[in-house]
Regions:
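NAD(P)+-binding Rossmann beta1-loop-alpha1 motif at the extreme N-terminus of oxidoreductases
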Residues: 1-63, 69-73, 100
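Rossmann-like NAD(P)(H) cofactor-binding subdomain of soluble oxidoreductases
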Residues: 65-158, 174-176
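Internal alpha-helical scaffold of NAD(P)-dependent oxidoreductase catalytic cores
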Residues: 93, 104, 129-140, 158-206, ...
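NAD(P)-dependent Rossmann-like dehydrogenase/reductase catalytic/cofactor-binding core
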Residues: 208-212, 237-247, 251, 255-345
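Short, well-ordered alpha-helices that flank and scaffold nucleotide-derived cofactor binding pockets
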Residues: 21, 25, 52, 99, ...
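Generic structural signal for well-ordered, non-membrane alpha-helical segments
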Residues: 12, 16, 43, 94, ...
C-alpha cells in the first residue's frame, strides 16, 4: 500500500466516529498514517458539527475530535480519492450503502469493516457482503474487531484490537494507521474467525443482559458467557475460522467487554427485555443498532446449515421472534444433555 493519504469512514455513529478519531491521532510515522479522515453522515447537523466544531453532538458529545477529521453528507464525495474506505454502518445496510457508492471507490482502495453482524436473508458475513457489493479481492479487505467499546476508545482509555486480512501486508498497513498511544492493534489472517467472534458475541450479550434484567446472579451470567464462547467457537471452526482466534481479543476479549459493560448496546437491550420490555420497544428506546437483535436469526440459520449446536443463540432467537416468553428463557440457556466440557462439546 502506498501512502494512506485520505481515509473515508462510512457511518458517523459512535464507533465510526471513535475509529476516525483513532486514525486521526495515530502516532505512526508520517507516510504510514492518514493525512485526512472524512466521515460520511446521513444527517447534515452532525456533519456540520463534526467539521466546524470537531464534535459529534449525537453520539460522542463530550469528545474533542482531531483537527484532521471532517464530515460530509454526500457519500460519493466522502469516498472520492480515498485510499482506505472504512465501513461503519449497521450490518443490514452494508450492501445497499456500498452498492450505491461502488463506482466512486478507487479500484486500489483498501476496504475496512467495523461491522459486527450477519446479513439477514443471505447469512453473509461483512467480508462476503463487501466482496459481493464491491468486487473487492481478499487482499484489499480487512476487518477490525475486539473489545472496542466506542466511548472508552474515544476517551483515550487503553484498548487492544485485532486487524485481520488474508493479506498480512494489508493487515499491517491498517494496524500502522490506527496504532496510537492508547490504541494497540494486533494482526492476523483469520478474517472468518475474527468476524464470527464479533458477530456472535452480540447474541450472547443479549442473553447476559436478559439474565441481568431478570435479577440473576454472577454465576448465571458467567456460565452463559463461558458456554457462549464455546458455541461461538464451534460455529467459527465450522465455517473456516481458527479456534485460537476465539481465545484472543476478537473472541474472548470482545465477548467479555460486550457482556460486562453497561456501555454495550446488546447487553443494554437484553437487560431491557429481561425487565419485561418488548423487543420492539427495547429497540425503539435505543439510539443505535443492537446488532444481536438484527442478526440472531441469521446466526441460527448459519449454525443449522453447518449442523452446529448453539442452544443459547437458539433461545435468544426464540425470544426475539416472539416464540418464547422471556420468563422461561433462563431454564433453556443451559439446557443441554450432560457431556464433557470443551468447545467441541
Amino acid at each position: 500500500m502506498s501512502r494512506p493519504g485520505r481515509v473515508a469512514v462510512l457511518g458517523a455513529g459512535s464507533w465510526g466516529t471513535a475509529f476516525a478519531a483513532v486514525m486521526g491521532s495515530s502516532t505512526s510515522p508520517e507516510g504510514r498514517r492518514a493525512d485526512r479522515i472524512v466521515l460520511w453522515s446521513r444527517r447534515r447537523e452532525i456533519a456540520d458539527a463534526i467539521t466546524l466544531g470537531h464534535r459529534n453532538p449525537e453520539y460522542l458529545p463530550d469528545i474533542d475530535l482531531p483537527e484532521n477529521i471532517s464530515a460530509v453528507t454526500d457519500i460519493h464525495q466522502a469516498v472520492s480519492d480515498a485510499a482506505v474506505v472504512v465501513v461503519a454502518v449497521p450490518a443490514q445496510h452494508v450492501r445497499e450503502t456500498l452498492t450505491t457508492v461502488k463506482d466512486s471507490i478507487a479500484e486500489d482502495a483498501i476496504v475496512v469493516s467495523l461491522v459486527k453482524g450477519l446479513e439477514r436473508g443471505t447469512g453473509e458475513r461483512p467480508s462476503q457482503v463487501c466482496a459481493s457489493a464491491l468486487g473487492v479481492p481478499p487482499e484489499r479487505f480487512a476487518v477490525v474487531s475486539g473489545p472496542n467499546l466506542a466511548l472508552e476508545i474515544a476517551r483515550g482509555e487503553p484498548t487492544a484490537t485485532v486487524v485481520a486480512s488474508e493479506s498480512a501486508e494489508t493487515a499491517e498497513a491498517i494496524a500502522a494507521m490506527t496504532a496510537g498511544r492508547t490504541f494497540r492493534p494486533y494482526t492476523n489472517t483469520d478474517v472468518v474467525g475474527v468476524e464470527i467472534g464479533g458477530i456472535v458475541k452480540n447474541v450472547i450479550a443479549l442473553a447476559v443482559g436478559i439474565c441481568d434484567g431478570q435479577g440473576l446472579g454472577d454465576n448465571s451470567k458467567a456460565s452463559v458467557i463461558t458456554r457462549g464462547l464455546a458455541e461461538t467457537t464451534r460455529l467459527a471452526i465450522a465455517v473456516g475460522g481458527r479456534p485460537e482466534t476465539m481465545a484472543g481479543l476478537a473472541g474472548l476479549g470482545d465477548l467479555v467487554a460486550t457482556c460486562a459493560s453497561p456501555l454495550s448496546r446488546n447487553r443494554s437491550a437484553g437487560r431491557l427485555i429481561g425487565t419485561g420490555m418488548g423487543v420492539d420497544e427495547a429497540v425503539a428506546s435505543m439510539k443505535q443498532t443492537a446488532e444481536g437483535i438484527k442478526s440472531v436469526s441469521a446466526v441460527v440459520d448459519l449454525a443449522r446449515r453447518h449442523d452446529v449446536e448453539m442452544p443459547i443463540s437458539e433461545a435468544i432467537n426464540a425470544v426475539v421472534s416472539g416464540r418464547l416468553e422471556v420468563a422461561t428463557l433462563a431454564d433453556l440457556l443451559l439446557s443441554r444433555n450432560l457431556k464433557s466440557e470443551g468447545h467441541r462439546a
